[in-house]
Amino acid sequence: ITKQYKQAKMKKIRAAVVGYGNIGKFTIEALEAAADFEIAGVVRRNGAENKPAELAQYDVVKDITELKDVDVAILATPTRSCQEYAEKILAMGINTVDSFDIHTSIVDYRRSLMPICKEHGTVAVIAAGWDPGSDSVVRTLMQSLAPKGLSYTNFGPGRSMGHSVCVRSKEGVKDALSMTIPVGEGIHRRMVYVELEEGADLEKVTAAIKADPYFANDETHVFQVASVDDLNDVGHGVNLVRKGVSGKTHNQLFEFNMKINNPALTAQVLVNVARASMRQQPGCYTMVEIPVIDYLAGEREDLIAHLV
């Protein structure tokens, strides 16, 4: 049992939330609902300036160094900012968790954080939203049940937060919504709705979106709209399917479905892995590498008695 885990059993886990957008707001709610956590504070660009009313009881700062006794930082930041924040915070002796969602970069990201974690005795849990994240755990279990076969992940229809943030970062885009539409067999169509800045060129914006790694491998359609807010809906979902072979027996079929509020579920997963981070040896982990029981609050034997 790690020193951090022993300490965590004696006192509440002090978590800082870095970023206060959609995921940050739901992370505060998930932390408030978790009896084994306390909120060390919130880090946002504006600090305490124009402090939201719902954060009145919490310390709100511009830099995590202004907070005291932080055990774990929950990075509710855009994916492309995760590594920068994680490297800095891990080197301070604070664990980090994030929902980094560029699937093709996860292995490299893990490899880059591993030596920092080892050097400073900290734990990072990366790519820990619902996909990548909890869906990855389900895919792993399904593959173990039928080692030979095919798995398909069908997202949506629903709003992709990561893709929407990516589009908003493009020059000329005032606001954006990226909808993920399942075509079937793991293939998706991206329907992107953009509200443009004055004088922006739709053709140039479309080219920039389609060239981005977030969109480059999917059929993508871009539409200009007068108001993205009129279209917004944070609902999403997934259908995971595996058909394969258990031993030498064919035609084994497994399916997992969910319809969700996207940022609320992402926030819950982040709180779960923040808890689990206190129970791991120093290093950088994805969710499939951590015992699932570590995501739950409570004594291990009590959980085993209830769940097994």
Q: What are the roles of these predicted feature ranges?
A:
Residues 24-25, 82:
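N-terminal Rossmann-fold NAD(P) dinucleotide-binding loop
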Residues 277-308:
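C-terminal helix-rich "cap/oligomerization" subdomain common to oxidoreductases
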Residues 134-154, 162-166, 170:
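Rossmann-like NAD(P)H-binding beta-loop-alpha module
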Residues 20-21:
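Glycine-rich Rossmann-fold phosphate-binding loop(s) that bind the pyrophosphate
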Residues 100-124:
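Rossmann-fold NAD(P)-binding glycine/threonine-rich loop
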Residues 69-91, 103-107:
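Beta-loop-alpha module in the N-terminal Rossmann-like domain of NAD(P)-dependent dehydrogenases
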Residues 1-9:
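N-terminal amphipathic/basic-hydrophobic helices that include classical n-h-c signal peptides
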Residues 14, 25-26, 33-64, 158-276, ...:
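C-terminal substrate-binding/catalytic lobe of Rossmann-fold NAD(P)-dependent oxidoreductases
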